[in-house]
């Protein structure tokens, strides 16, 4: 066979050079690859160590309870203490607790029409909605019926109800608890009252001050927030009929014309929970000064163990008082109640980790139908100071006994 000897030599030389280069690359590549693997491993260890150092500070290590979390790296072991990541848990032991309270609420036809057009912004602006939603617990006076059944009570000037579908408004407010011990929640009879309980329960909104029987109506709503326990009671000193009172097997509301039962419950709760609160329906409509019986009842609640007393019903704001170091809020007025909402308040009660209580008033009013924070509240605070009993109000709304 004929072939070009010179060409063959060149091809053999090229193949020799190729295999030599391949062998050199292989010998050099092994240590490079090993070094790269070691580098990646050490980097990963550093990342894990940094994660533990940054995200598990000593302040988040609580005692007593153990919680195992799947999010932790495998190398982290949980031993005797509970480890809580702030990014993972809403409850933070030793953080203050913010409870917000609003007064009388009923959704008028005008409000409903606005809601259908503009959503929840028809009720309150973004700032007020944020304050309601961001509280650890938000509670209001639910002064109407959720039902389409029943007949309006005869000889009653105002009977109030809404279609159950509008419970979504309360949800959009961020409502956690509603007080139903008042003079409107049975306006359409027991069937409609039971519909109200069912509607609230389905919406996962707790109710207090009423129920299927006296045992439920007189029981508090209990919450544990940031390591502190709260028992919230509700009762009414205003009722159109004795038939509205809950009985052993009768649905209804918890009354405090005779405060014996409530005071006994408060005394028991005081020994079980860190804080006890009374949300009470009382007073005379449109009277800016509390009745003497309101002051007497409030002091009795405090003697029995209450740490805060909050009142509703007069549809106007009333003043404040401290008794044995415990604040009494005589009336929060209308919050969102038809067209009758004037100047009103969102009350913020902040409990520190050591149990101290600070009360701050968030003044608000309706502007073009929308609840809006009052930016210059000095005049309102001066008025409320004059209505109060030995209580001052700072420029930022803090009650000063």
Please report, for each region that a protein language model flagged, where it lies by residue:
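Acidic, metal/ion-coordinating pockets
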Residues: 25-401
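Short, Lys/Arg-enriched N-terminal segments with co-localized hydrophobic residues
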Residues: 1-14
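Positively charged n-region of N-terminal signal peptides that target proteins for export
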Residues: 15-20
